Amino acid sequence: MAQLNFGGTVENVVIRDEFPLEKAREVLKNETIAVIGYGVQGPGQALNLRDNGFNVIVGQRQGKTYDKAVADGWVPGETLFGIEEACEKGTIIMCLLSDAAVMSVWPTIKPYLTVAA
């Protein structure tokens, strides 16, 4: 583990040698990662996870960014869903919505969050 200084705060950070990609794939092999939001952060993170062999779905409401998700290869009803359905299907939920969007969507997401074991 490395200790890194982020603006005066020292953090312990797991490095790649300690947790390589193959180990991450093994740990997450039975998980479905639901990326909620396909605006600024969603595409990069969802595509990176998918390209690295993780089981990923996207939750996005209809509109321009939904169409972008389709253009990026996400398949409606298979890997692309509305927000609530993606939360229901995901075992890990990554909320990548803007702060403003989270405020309006939070009541939809909250029931699907659980305390990790």
Predicted regions and their residues:
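Rossmann-like NAD(P)-binding element
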Residues: 61, 74-117
